[in-house]
Amino acid sequence: LTSLQNPEKSKNKVPSGSVNRESGLWSLIRQGMKSSGRSIETTRLESWAVPGVPDVLLCAESGRFSFLELKVVRDGSRKLALSAHQCAWLSRHAGSPSFVVVRDRSLAISVFDGAAAVDLRMDGFSAVAPLAVFEEPYDWEEFLKLTCPL
């Protein structure tokens, strides 16, 4: 099996059992940040406090903030499980550096503009053009230039 067919053989290791969860995607992104050499402050947000707020707040070295909503697609579905609260938050903050980051079954990471949340929920991510798609080995510097600009 190739690394794309078997997450256990992937060069981008995440904790065992979490490859198909948002926490596994977050672990992978954190590892990428460390390897990039950037000094990005991160906060994993608790959605129970304010429904719909994205999963991660990033603060670039310049002090600029951005938000990441993390999603992992486990099956063949192309629609994302974005809640009405998440769509509302991302729509209200359209124009801000807010992103929906999706890891699919092939382990590719697609980055979408947060303003596309409603379309992603209703029509699926095959109907919305991503800002970028990152395949293994991931180019974390480019990923961070997009999602956490200076």
Where are these regions (language model features)?
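Conserved catalytic cores of phosphodiester-cleaving nucleases, focusing on short active-site segments
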Residues: 56-58, 64-75
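Sequence/structural signature of beta-propeller domains
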Residues: 80, 116-123
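Nucleic-acid nuclease catalytic cores
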Residues: 91-118
